[in-house]
């Protein structure tokens, strides 16, 4: 989603493909009717659990509204501020309205705020506690700026398509990993009194054809994500279940179609899965311009349209009058919105909506300081921990008091201006050639208070050390001083909203690496990557001694990297995706789906692979990756021992969970602990470090391994710590499409614990 200004132009530029119509083309969407089951009526919010007080207040508030005031709450309006969207005020009842703004890694299009690390970077940290702290400090900036709702975080896309343009906004390709990190992120943000609108619900896995478009007089519908019930529950709905359980006050529905019904008027996904099965108490907001039906969308469970609506307004009251919509539906829409306002305690002491969001940052405006010195430590640490060291030949890193270093590559320098933080590109280049990459493009961009670029931070380090630095960041085949101790090469891999990537490598950057490596025996490569980046063209070069996937660290990029290069911090990041040896190893999930054959006007993307994406697919097909999911090196070594598996006897292991009233997140018994696992980890290396212990389970009739636990622990040199994992009923279950329940199967389950999805020194089993 995006600011109102420029919306039409942006949508017109979004990546679109179409097939010319033929006699065989399907020309009416009536062909697809019924593929997404109808679920009506839209359930009313119950105000259960932690929502009780907010709902009581909201119902009293809504009871005093006129029909027109209720309608006004359901659609955005223009306002003299820079918020991405606004809900109008109701002055007579002291409701000041709402400001909602991008994005999940810091505010966009404003000043006096920080540019935080992106979702993929947080995913690479594997640090739940840090994710919550990042959310809390980031949320406090939104609060000071008068932003009621943060448009994020992201768990859709999950990362099904390797070239997906927005994969970098999410945390991980694994639903369990993504779910735990989004849970902690939401808890942190909302603890600051700012609501989250978690996105994009659901199965929004490519940018190509995400919106309906007309080109040369040909109308092409948005792509349809066609998903079976089992895959939906076990993969794509999984992290959203954690979102609801965390209490997210809003969820943003997506652009594309789901089983040939648009995401923002799909009664199965909104009424059925979200509001009934998961017990969601907040409100559903459209992505910007994602409403395609009037009363059909409200009856399907949509509660708020952004940035405005031409299909609702007085049409809602007319529909109530003519009986095509129940008055209770409008009341529920308004109640959910106002209850969320109360739930965040924004009725008392919250700044005026949008007060710190100027419509034009270059015009005179009041300075509202969002950032705080209290955030500096968390800001830097969140940047540090998302770096992943994947090669370290002969312990090249950390650098050992070098007398001279040389820096090469376009990604080393800072930008010439901050305009990049505000712009929308009308295309998606393979790289950002003009400066270091701290964030991807589109509505997920953010506004840095400063940028610590790698070259700047390295020069500062050299000043402090009294050493020397040479640099040539523009040459493709630079000269290298033979006396240099290390050659640091900086490249990047760009991605943006609106477009899927054209590939996972770029020849120019690879050529730069090999050119330097041919002249320098100690070449260290840093990649700022907005998604998967292949390295097969040079990873085995004998002079490439170390490689870091630096992801998208935010404004502290250079400072964080220097902490790692010089050994003041020990790398602890792990990959939240699989890096293949060859692009073809991703198979049908490499490229986005394009319109073809009889579906030229109604693109169809069949998720026929089921749950087998990324490492699950590599395991199933026996493909050896370059670097597996969960992989990352350290400056120390960790030894695993003492696997202990103990079943919890006081919780039911019945086939289906005991019946219970639905709470936020679904049946509360899904979180009953069934199994406890513990392992001992010893730091047998030379320095203290953080290790991410990962637990995988082989569930009968499922993938070889699925992540079902991870803990990040600090271990001093020579010390041993015991790491414990608690596995709930959902963690060990599969979705029964007949019973429509989570099924705990009888049989033998495999348990694996170790350093990555393929480095698992401990293995055991248990039987249910």
Curated annotation (Swiss-Prot):
GO terms for cellular component: extracellular region. Coiled coil: none annotated. It is found in: Secreted. SUPFAM superfamilies: (Trans)glycosidases, Beta-D-glucan exohydrolase, C-terminal domain. It catalyses: Hydrolysis of terminal, non-reducing beta-D-glucosyl residues with release of beta-D-glucose. The keyword Zinc does not apply. The active site is at residue 287. Glycans are attached at residues 25, 72, 259, 315, 322, 394, 434, 472, 543, 651. Keywords: Carbohydrate metabolism, Cellulose degradation, Glycoprotein, Glycosidase, Hydrolase, Polysaccharide degradation, Secreted, Signal. It holds the Pfam family Fn3-like. Its EC number is 3.2.1.21. Residues 1-19 form the signal peptide. GO terms for biological process: cellulose catabolic process. SMART domains: Fn3_like. Beta-glucosidases are one of a number of cellulolytic enzymes involved in the degradation of cellulosic biomass. Catalyzes the last step releasing glucose from the inhibitory cellobiose. This is Probable beta-glucosidase M. The lineage of its organism: Eukaryota, Fungi, Dikarya, Ascomycota, Pezizomycotina. The gene is bglM.
